[in-house]
Amino acid sequence: MTHQTHAYHMVNPSPWPLTGALSALLMTSGLIMWFHFNSMYLLMLGLTTNTLTMYQWWRDIVRESTFQGHHTPIVQKGLRYGMILFIVSEVFFFAGFFWAFYHSSLAPTPELGGCWPPTGITPLNPMEVPLLNTSVLLASGVSITWAHHSLMEGNRKHMLQALFITISLGIYFTLLQASEYYETPFTISDGIYGSTFFMATGFHGLHVIIGSTFLIVCFVRQLKFHFTSNHHFGFEAAAWYWHFVDVVWLFLYVSIYWWGS
C-alpha cells in the first residue's frame, strides 16, 4: 500500500464470498429438506455459516473503512452505486410477486370460483393488525430520518436514541407479523391466494429482519464512535434500505391486505 498512487481500494483476498455462497447453498437445500422431509439440520448449518460469514465480512469492512482508511470519496461513490443497484434489483424481485398477485386476482379462473378472494378463503381484516403494522413501519421511517439528521448535525445522543427507537419498531413489526401468521385462517398451500400472500409478505418480513440487522450493526458502530457527521455511508446505506422496506410495505398493504380482501 505504500506505493499506491490512486484512490481506489485494492481488496485483499478474502474467503467470505466463498463461505457466503456455501451458506446460500446450505440454506436453500436446507429449506427443501425441511419442507419435504421435516429435517432442519441442513438449514441450521446454513444459517450458522451465514451468520459467521456476515460477522467476519462486516468486521473486515469496518476495519478497512475506519482504521485502515481505504474508503476514500471515490470508493464511497462506488459503494453508493452498488447499493442503489442492489435496491433496484430488489424492486424487480418484489415486482414479480405483485405481478403474480395481480395476474391471479384481476382475472380469477373458474377453479378459484371466478372471484377474488377465492371461494373458501377468509382474508385478514386490513383494519386490524395490518394497519397497526403500517403505522409501526411509517413511525420507524420517521425515527430513522431523525437519526440521520442527528448524525449529520453531530448530535450523538439523539442519533442513538432515534436509532434505538427504529430498531425497536422493526422488532415489534416482526413480532406482530409472526402473531398474524400464527392466526391466519389459511396456509401457504391454500392455492394461489395463500402462495402469493405468504411469499410476498414473508419475503418482506425477511427484508425487515435483514434491515433490522443492518441497523443493529450501525447502532453498535455508533457506540464505538465509527461514524462522523460527513463519513457514515454504512448508516446511510442501511437507512436507504429501511426506506425501501417501508415503501414496499405500503404497496403490500394497499394491494394484498386492503384491495385484495
From Swiss-Prot:
It is found in: Mitochondrion inner membrane. Residues 1-15, 67-72, 153-155, 224-232 are mitochondrial matrix. Disulfide bonds: none annotated. One of its GO terms (biological process) is respiratory chain complex IV assembly. The chain crosses the membrane at residues 16-34, 41-66, 73-105, 129-152, 156-183, 191-223, 233-256. Residues 35-40, 106-128, 184-190, 257-261 are mitochondrial intermembrane. One of its GO terms (molecular function) is cytochrome-c oxidase activity. GO terms for cellular component: mitochondrial inner membrane; respiratory chain complex IV. Keywords: Membrane, Mitochondrion, Mitochondrion inner membrane, Translocase, Transmembrane, Transmembrane helix. It holds the Pfam family COX3. Its EC number is 7.1.1.9. InterPro entries: Cyt_c/ubiquinol_Oxase_su3, Cyt_c_oxase_su3_dom, Cyt_c_oxidase-like_su3, Cyt_c_oxidase_su3-like_sf, Cyt_c_oxidase_su3_a-hlx. It catalyses: 4 Fe(II)-[cytochrome c] + O2 + 8 H(+)(in) = 4 Fe(III)-[cytochrome c] + 2 H2O + 4 H(+)(out). It is a multi-pass membrane protein. Signal peptide: none annotated. Component of the cytochrome c oxidase (complex IV, CIV), a multisubunit enzyme composed of 14 subunits. The complex is composed of a catalytic core of 3 subunits MT-CO1, MT-CO2 and MT-CO3, encoded in the mitochondrial DNA, and 11 supernumerary subunits COX4I, COX5A, COX5B, COX6A, COX6B, COX6C, COX7A, COX7B, COX7C, COX8 and NDUFA4, which are encoded in the nuclear genome. Belongs to the cytochrome c oxidase subunit 3 family. Component of the cytochrome c oxidase, the last enzyme in the mitochondrial electron transport chain which drives oxidative phosphorylation. The respiratory chain contains 3 multisubunit complexes succinate dehydrogenase (complex II, CII), ubiquinol-cytochrome c oxidoreductase (cytochrome b-c1 complex, complex III, CIII) and cytochrome c oxidase (complex IV, CIV), that cooperate to transfer electrons derived from NADH and succinate to molecular oxygen, creating an electrochemical gradient over the inner membrane that drives transmembrane transport and the ATP synthase. This is Cytochrome c oxidase subunit 3. The gene is MT-CO3.
